[in-house]
Design a protein with these regions (language model features):
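Lipolytic serine-hydrolase domain surface
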Residues: 1-94, 138, 155-219, 237-366
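Short hydrophobic segments within beta-strands
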Residues: 9, 126-127, 224, 287
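Acidic, polar low-complexity linker/tail segments
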Residues: 87-120
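Short, surface-exposed "cap/lid" segments of acyl-processing enzymes
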Residues: 114-168
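Short, charged/polar micro-motifs that form catalytic or ligand-binding hotspots
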Residues: 127-135, 179, 183, 223
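Short catalytic micro-motifs in class I SAM-dependent methyltransferases
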Residues: 128-129, 227, 235, 260
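Gly/Ala-rich beta-loop-alpha elbow adjacent to hydrolase catalytic centers
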Residues: 193, 225, 229, 233
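Residue in the alpha/beta-hydrolase core beta-strand immediately N-terminal to the catalytic nucleophile
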Residues: 222, 226-227, 257
Length: 366
């Protein structure tokens, strides 16, 4: 068995009496409030040969790499993972800004990630969607990390680190009850994500101030929102705007990926909740699939307008020039066809092939 490590941030309530070494995280908000964030890393044991076999599995019409089966396998492994939250020492009754001697978990994790990036590795923040338990979230995030590093264009000397943000979605397959509950919890969790973005902004600003003219490491932080994760992003942008002076949001990410986005298909138009997402990134990619049954269910059984993740933007000409769309319908296979961001290296390859390229670069493959 081989050990695998994953970084995480969460506003879930921990399971067990030891908050720094919990048994896991549940489907309720932290007792310290929905915007309270715990940062940490977990280590799980898994069969390296089984992982390699799943990553090498050939898929019909979509290259190789069965990410969904890999996520299922790692979900089982996650139930016995060792969890180490970064310890904190600070008062809850006043702002951490007023506590110069406070010990913050976010600062400790950011420092560790900075060390990873200095070894020529990018970081990808992953926000999951609806109906996802703690083990499910860990399995998906770690599968994504392994798939990215196994992709054809992956540099063996550059290791992508996925940072999971997991929020208390129900993890219950009760379509009407769970979806409505998760939608409410996603809104509150979006503000927690925004708080996390503010912490990243402040950390990067502090690094810049202390750099003394030294060149940055040259690596990027990216963001991938799956399904209802894009709904969280709407509220994260609102919180970021509320605490950002000036007229522009801070540019935090190299690339933002909106995969199977469970938001309205006009969400990126001027005046809509995601209209300013281009301000926080160099590029924004919308991945959609016309055969995504989860999007159909969201449209018709939940009474939602047409979803962005099904047919893409309603009026493409109204999108900012940094936003582009990828129709995954021809290469996605399966019954539900919703978690295709994990489904084969064909899609993973597409993500890596456009990373860092300008919108008009001829190397971009549509």
């Amino acid at each position: 068995m081989t050990e695998y490590t994953l970084y995480y941030a969460t506003n879930r309530k921990h399971n067990g009496s030891d908050r720094w070494h919990p048994k896991g995280y549940g489907n309720k908000f932290s007792d310290d409030g929905m915007e309270n964030l715990r940062f940490g890393q977990l280590t799980l044991e898994a069969d390296e040969k089984k992982i390699a076999k799943l990553l090498a599995k050939k898929l019909r019409g979509n290259g190789c790499g069965d990410g969904e089966k890999l996520a299922e396998y790692l979900t089982g492994c996650a139930k016995t993972a060792r969890i180490d939250a970064y310890e904190e020492v600070l008062r809850a009754d006043i702002s951490d800004k007023a506590q110069p001697d406070a010990k913050l978990g976010s600062q400790a994790m950011f420092a560790d990630l900075k060390a990873c990036m200095e070894q020529r590795g990018d970081v990808l923040v992953f926000i999951h969607g609806f109906n996802t338990s703690w083990p499910d979230a860990v399995g998906s995030a770690l599968a994504l990390q392994l798939a990215l590093n196994a992709a054809e264009q992956a540099d063996p000397n550059r290791h992508v680190r996925v940072v999971l943000f997991t929020w208390p979605s129900d993890g219950l397959a009760l379509p009407f009850v769970s979806y409505k509950s998760d939608r409410s919890e996603a809104a509150g969790s979006g503000y927690a994500v925004g708080r996390g973005f503010l912490k990243v902004r402040d950390f990067l600003a502090d690094l810049h101030d202390r750099a003394g003219g030294a060149k940055p490491c040259g690596q990027n932080i990216h963001l991938l929102c799956h399904s209802m994760g894009s709904y969280l992003l709407q509220f994260a942008l609102r919180r970021l705007d509320a605490f950002t002076p000036g007229s522009a949001l801070p540019r935090l990410f190299g690339h933002v990926f909106l995969c199977a986005a469970d938001v309205n298909d006009n969400a990126l138009e001027p005046g809509q909740p995601l209209a300013r997402v281009h301000e926080i990134a160099d590029n924004v990619s919308i991945y959609h699939n016309r055969s995504d049954m989860a999007m159909v269910v969201s449209d018709y059984t939940k009474g939602n307008p047409e979803r962005l993740g099904r047919a893409g933007a309603a009026r493409p000409l109204l999108l900012h020039h940094k936003v582009h769309q990828i129709d995954c319908t021809p290469i996605v296979k399966g019954i539900v066809e919703h978690s295709y961001y994990l489904g084969g290296r064909g899609i993973i390859k597409k993500k890596k092939s456009i990373d860092g390229l300008a919108q008009d670069d001829s190397a971009r493959k549509r």
